[in-house]
Amino acid sequence: MKYYIIATRVNLSGYPETFTISYDNEATDDYDNFMFFDTEEEAQEWTKSKQAAEWKDCTFEVIKDGE
């Protein structure tokens, strides 16, 4: 199984926007560009990384691919 991360933040209009993080540390909705992890633990570790810190005001959720 593979895992990926969903990020959510409140946009300037006050509404939540949800997106996935790409390998380039960009927001994406393109499945082919999702940053995948081999284990849930690796994905959880990413949420505490310097890359994740660049996404200020975001909350992260680890998703199992195929759910």
For the regions a protein language model found, what residue spans apply to each?
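Short aromatic-glycine-(Arg/Gly/Cys) micro-motifs in beta-strand/loop hairpins
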Residues: K2-Y31, K50, F60-V62
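Short, mixed-charge low-complexity intrinsically disordered segments
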Residues: D32-E67
